[in-house]
Amino acid sequence: MTNPTVRRGRRAAAVALPLAAGLLLAACASGGSGSNAKEPQTITFSYGPANANDTAYSTLAKDYEAAHPGVTIKVNKISAEVYGQTLQTQMAAGNGPDVMQINSGGGQAGTIGTLGKAGLLLPLTDSSFNSDIPAAERAGYDYNGQLYGVPSATSIDAVIYNDQLAKSDGVTVDATSSLQDVLKQCPAVKSKGKSIFALAGSTPPNTGIMTVEIATSTVYGPNPNWDKDRSSGKTSFEKTKGWHQALQAVVDMNKAGCFQPGAAGAGFADLTNASSSGKAYGFFAPSGAVKSIEDASGGHVKLIALGFPSPAGKNYLSLSSDIGLAGNKKTKSPKLVQDFIKFSVSPAEAKKFAEAQGTIPIGGSLSASDLLPQYQSVAQQLADKQYRTFAVDNWTKPEVYNALGTGVTGLLTGQKTIDDVLKAMDAAWDA
C-alpha cells in the first residue's frame, strides 16, 4: 500500500520548481444505491487540479458526453489544497460524487486506501482494466486485492534536461549514458562555471527523488520485488549492494563537481536559478515539469525527460501514476460510472489527457508517435518496458523517504556515511 504523503510531497516539489523559477516567472449528492430500474444518465464528477488552469478532466467529461448522447456529467472543480479532505468528508457523509479524482495508495484523506478500507468505493470489475493497464501503472489502485481505481496518466521521475544547451557546450547525456559517462564530463563543465546537474541538497524531497532514480536501476531493475523482500525481512537497505551503489553514485558525483557549488545547502530557489540562468543543464523532478516550464517560457526553452544514468547495468526509468479516477459505491449509475472510467483510459482519451498534462499516456503498448517530444529520447525504453514503479510508491512510511533525503544531505556535507544513511532507513522502516 502506498503512502501519499510521499507522493504529494514529491508533486508539491515539482510544482515549486516551475513556479519559483525565473522561467514562470460541495459536490452534488449521488446518494442511494443501485436498483433494477434503468440507471440515471446524469452523474457527478469531482476533481482537484494542482494547476487552476488545468482542464484535462473537464475535457474528458465533455468528450464522453459527445460520444454518448443523453449522458450528462456535472463537473465540480475543488481547490487542490482542500480536495482530499473535502472528498473524504463528502464520501463519509454519503453525498460524495459518482466519479472522483483520487490519489493511489493510503494513509491520508481521499485516497484509495482510506476510502477503500471504509467500503465507499465501487469495485472495478471489467477485465480490460487489468489487461490494458500495466501493473507498474496500476500500483496503489487496489485494496485487499480488489481494484477500485485507475491511473489517468504516467510520469517519469526524471532528470529534466536542457539537451540543446548541453550539446552546445559539448556535453552529451542521453538514455544510453552510464554514470561513468557523466562523471568523466563533470570536471570540464565545472571549469566553465557550470554543472551538469542542479540539486536542492538541503531539501529532502529533491535529494530523495534523485537517489531513488538511481536505485531504480541498481536495486529495482535486478529485483522488482525488493520492497516485498524488505517487508518480509529477507533483506534490508544496509545489506543490499544496489542501495550502496546508489548512494556511492551521489558521493562520486559530488566529488567530481557534477552539482552546482554549494549544492549541499541549496534550496529550490538555488536549483531553479541555476537551471534558468543556464548554469546547470538538468535537475531532478517528475517529468510533468517539462510542460510547465516550457509553457511558462513561451516556447523559448526546450527540455527533455531522461532516466538517471546507471552506475551498474541497464538504465531503468522510474514511473509514477499517482493520480487517477474511482467510483462511488453508492452511485445509482454503477454501469455508467464504470464505463466512464473505462473511457478515460481508452487510447485516444489517454493520449489527449497526457498531452494536456505533459505526461505519458496510460497503457502498455506505446509507440514513439504516442509520446510528446520531451519523451522521444526514452521512447525505446518505454517500448521495451525498461522501467519500474517509483520505489517510494510502495513504501508504507514517509519517514523512510525522509531518512533517505536527509541522509543524502549528510553525505554531501560529509557528516554521514553510506552505512549511516542505510541504517537510518532500516530503522525508519522497522519503527
Could you say what each language-model-derived stretch is?
Residues Q357-G364, S377-D430:
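C-terminal capping/gating helix-and-loop segments adjacent to ligand/active sites or protein-protein/ligand interfaces
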Residues R230-A263:
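Glycine-centered hinge/linker elements that transmit conformational signals in sensory
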Residues Y148-P151, L183-T235:
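Extracytoplasmic/periplasmic solute-binding protein
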